[in-house]
């Protein structure tokens, strides 16, 4: 895990794909293996290339609400219950920058398309939400989790993370406190039985 900045622009070069691509997968932190701010985290991997990886923690709500965040950027959000939704801790990199993971993907000025989802970093998606015509489902974070070239692969080799194909329902519909066990259940794992000695799927 690194605190270095990561370019969020998708690269069209097919040669940039890593041997094992973890894009559109969940990383589930293994007990005793992942420490610090990412302990106990479920991370949705938005982009993974030979240059590194970018993901968002999806199970760490903060005390900041969307209404408060919108006020900071001079937008008014009056839609309930959206305005009371929490902003999430997305990771330790660029914690002053907002990231919006949403569905449907829509057409915004700075987005990475992820199948039916998109990661948008431009203000226009928040303006659309304020206007009442934003994406139907979204998760807003401050910060992201970033890895340099080969770092994620190294952590996987050390069994720091379990991996499983991402489920949008867990991202958007499951209560934050239940997302870690829900992600484990995708692998058929009971959280109570999980130990630090297992490998990745």
Curated annotation (Swiss-Prot):
Belongs to the UPF0301 (AlgH) family. GO terms for cellular component: cytosol. It comes from Bordetella petrii (strain ATCC BAA-461 / DSM 12804 / CCUG 43448). It holds the Pfam family DUF179. InterPro entries: AlgH-like. This is UPF0301 protein Bpet0561.
